Amino acid sequence: TLNGAAVERNLRAFELGRWAVLHPEDAKRVMTPNVVALPKTLDEKIAFRKDHLTAYQGKGLAKRYGAMLDKITDDRLKEAVALGYHKLLSYKDEYEVARLLKSTRAKVAEAFEGDPKMTFNLAPPIMSKAGADGRPMKRTFGAWMEGPFNILARMKFLRGTPFDPFGRTEERRMERSLITQYEADMKDVLPKLTDATHDAIVALAELPLQIRGFGPVKQANEAKAAKRREELLAVIRSGGTQSSRAAE
């Protein structure tokens, strides 16, 4: 096995099985399917993302998101922007991780009796070294981290400000610059929307969905997306006269 990964998984599976035998009622609650109705219509998808941005940062960010979408009447393009713009605006930083973990803790408390303890596998940017694959190595933190996480989740108002202690990292600066760039691109290309440029503009609007991952992985995907962005902008600015394959 690679670094004992399979052994660790087997041990976890064994512990999980033993826990299920000792706590059958809790196991039953956890294994009961939790069916969530996903948004289906475009309006539902937009409303869902507005709610998420409000929880992520506040009403101001949701309003900023909505203002962009209000400028678009073409449904296909509007959905592309709804997805792409939302992904950029809601980059997963330390404050969002803390908020999500706080939410997870509340769900765990509902699912289990007593006072279950949680451990966290994290790779804090200011504390983590790169592994052999170039990715930050994760460290295990105990339940004592719940207190700091609760505080951190309430400090999201610092996000993107000069007082943000995490905002100076290369990844955070990149994420903020991508938002500014996207807004400028949409302002540039929306007036150029025609039948000939439509597919290229939709592809440009959806491009942020390709920037996945964290750390070196995200940076590599961003570099690929940057190259693709230049290709699409060239098609759009030429009136869609270049090879149609550039927008596929």
Q: What kind of region is each of these model predictions?
A:
Residues 2-248:
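Active-site loops and adjacent core secondary-structure elements that bind or stabilize anionic groups
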